[in-house]
Design a protein with these regions (language model features):
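Midchain, well-structured core segments that form catalytic/ion-binding scaffolds
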Residues: 1-114
């Protein structure tokens, strides 16, 4: 848990030094079950976004280094699972075509107020 807390502190300091386009969010998914017991396991879910893949990859590497530093300070280990890909843009042409065809077939009727 202490490593997870130190990781969170590190991410807060990291946020002060990223571009305004970056978005970094995290939550403690697992952090123990009793207030007076130090858990043997803690888990943090972090989401990093930015304008392009290169920036996200750089921020991800930085966050990993923060996690490794937190683990080093607490004599624990840090493990990483990458659950989502990092895409600049992942277009869905078939869905876009279907949506366009539907909008043409069933035009939206607007009122004067809208």
């Amino acid at each position: 848990l202490k490593a997870a807390e130190l990781f969170g502190i590190g991410i807060q300091f990291m946020r002060e030094h990223v571009l305004p386009t970056a978005r970094i969010h995290y939550v403690y998914e697992s952090a123990g079950s009793a207030p007076n017991v130090v858990p043997d396991f803690a888990q943090v879910w972090i989401v990093i976004r930015d304008l392009d893949r290169e920036k996200v990859a750089a921020l991800t590497d930085w966050a990993r280094e923060i996690a490794e530093g937190a683990a080093l300070m607490t004599e624990t280990t840090a493990e990483f699972d990458l659950f989502f890909g990092m895409y600049d843009l992942l277009p869905n042409e078939p869905l876009a075509r279907l949506a366009y065809d539907h909008l043409i077939a069933e035009p939206i009727e607007w009122t004067e107020e809208e």
